């Protein structure tokens, strides 16, 4: 299973990775590959090259012009078969 994290803050990148590794240990999934992207632009560049991921954790408030919501729309437009989980610390979402 390919899991991707699109998060611009290192602290939260690590927290999400730790949660995934804990889940992996509890469920005995040995075939997990985690990729971390610090910006939506980095992720879009790979998606444009037909890169695939099964599960994607996206921070809603990414630094830069493209938000996590924008990234999700792009993935939808590309008709990729990816499950998206939005992550945020903001109460308005």
Give the predicted meaning of each segment.
Residues 10-17:
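Charged phosphotransfer/docking patches of two-component systems
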Residues 58-60:
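Active-site residues of response regulator receiver
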